[in-house]
Amino acid sequence: RTRFWANRLQGPALAITFDPPPHQVLHPGSERPPLTTLEERAAWLEQAGVDHLIVLQTTRELLSWEAEEFFQRVLVQQLRAKALVEGRDFRFGRQRRGDVILLEQWCCQAGCHFEVVPPVLHEGMPISSSRVRQAVEQGQVELARWLLGRPYSVAGQVVVGARRGQSLGFPTANLDGIRTLLPANGVYAVRVSQDRCHRSKTTAGLPQPGTFAATANPDKAESNNRPPPFPRLGAAHIGPNPTFGEHQRKLEVHLLDFQGDLYGQVLRVEFLARLRDTRRFHSPEELQEQLRRDIEAVRQWREPPGESW
């Protein structure tokens, strides 16, 4: 609907986000991994037809503004908005006093079109970031895919690991520098691709906005190796490795039918289905047999109707 109004009024389609999230400013120490990075958010919005993403630096001063002050200073004076599209449960301003009823009144006074879009439902309940987060935290990646309309994914850089997978005949790529929420511990069928830099039209801050090019991962990949054909199916393990007495939680991925060097490359891992829980095996041979079964399960995975590579 934002794209509709932009076309109708012959202006750019803008989206506004806050960075960092307001709850981190109001409640220091409450940080938790986000579902997406700011750069990923910019890329998804750009794909959806948004021309510019306005990033407001979240400060206590900004959060102290009353709702009408925010409306006047940001939407009217700074952005000169001609149309505004919001969800019915949107709240803003000090102590979340602003709502869509007030927005409609103020937009009418300012000569700004206003539209409230209905929520998108799944099984009779509105889709929200809280539902997505809960699904990911519980390892319900199939549910997360339905809620998002795409597989949930994370990105990280391939680093040197213990190389136990290679000794077992199943080499894995160990991913580091992941900035978003990892699903629950377990083994998953995944789809892996090379994470390319997204160039998104993003405006940071007010009242003096600037533009930056958003990338999916700030770490510079130092590998000059030729990337493998992507996308490629794989089996991913999240969690410690109890069979070898390891306690560190990590993400490692075995790419099906691939041999090569991925060190330094930034990979994106899409979670397609959960295969099983993490468990301790009595011997490396028992682990090998289970890995064979996991890989066969990945080969048997079929894309849900309506989705395509």
Where are these regions (language model features)?
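N-terminal catalytic cores of NTP/NDP-binding nucleotidyl/phosphoryl-transfer enzymes
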Residues: 1-37, 43
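Solvent-exposed alpha-helix faces
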Residues: 3, 7, 149, 291-296
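Divalent metal-dependent hydrolysis catalytic cores, especially in the metallo-beta-lactamase
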Residues: 14, 52-56, 82-86
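ATP-dependent adenylation/nucleotidyltransferase module used to activate substrates
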Residues: 45-47
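Classical nucleotidyltransferase
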Residues: 61-171, 278-292
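Phosphate/ribose-recognition catalytic cores of enzymes acting on nucleotide-derived substrates
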Residues: 162-309
